[in-house]
Amino acid sequence: MSLKADFLGTANKKGEKKMSIAEQFAALGVVPVVVLNDVKDAEPLADALVKGGLPCAEVTFRTDAAEESIRIMAQKYPDMLVGAGTVLTIEQVDRAVNAGAKFIVSPGFDPEVVDYCIEKQIPIFPGIITPSDAAQAVKRGLKVVKFFPAEQFGGVATIKAMAAPYTTLKFMPTGGVSLKNLKDYLSCDKILCCGGSWMVKGDLVKAGEFDKIAQMAKEAVELAKEIRG
């Protein structure tokens, strides 16, 4: 079966081209990686991210609350970039998309999950860590991949080395990315954006400190824009 990814922007009713998911990621510079243990936190968290100028969330499928949280966030903010992370199976892909997820992120490269998403034209950003993973992504026509866990596997230096032979790929490093090293990552032209959880930490969500989350989201977006000019 020959599968090629083609997640390009589509035209709206006025004939204007809409930005693709990847283009929207690039414009933001940062993608919040969210873990929600209680669905009651979904709406106020979405409010905080939108207020902070970061209308995007990769909601990890690690908890029982993930699916319904995606549904709540997507319904409250239809234009928000709400996606599902830590997706391991086709069944989870279907559940996430049915709940309103606009994109799928997986921690590793599972050919079955990736091929399914491509076939269904669901934007998929699979995790890679080796040149063999990168080769599989390129073979399928993918343009953007997650690099995870980033810091534990060499960070920017490894990404630059990996990008040298695989020139068509852009990377979304996640894992160990913070305000302290964001400049190192976003200064690399092979990096599309960074995934991070520092602005949506579990303890802040649990404590209901959504104003602080909004402020931290704002700081992250402003720093990303400053770095990239």
Question: What spans do the regions from the language model cover?
Answer:
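Conserved N-terminal beta1-alpha1 strand-loop-helix module at the mouth
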Residues: 7, 13-99, 119, 179, ...
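Catalytic beta/alpha-barrel core
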Residues: 34-35, 56-63, 81-88, 101-109, ...
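Glycine-enriched alpha-helix->loop->beta-strand junction motifs that scaffold or abut catalytic
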Residues: 50-55, 76-79, 98-104, 119-125, ...
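Catalytic cores of alpha/beta
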Residues: 89-99, 132-140, 178-192
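Glycine-rich phosphate-binding active-site loops on the catalytic face of alpha/beta enzymes
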Residues: 107-113, 146-155, 190-209
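Anionic-ligand binding region
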Residues: 131-143, 155-165
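Active-site glycine- and acidic-residue-rich loops that bind
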Residues: 171-179
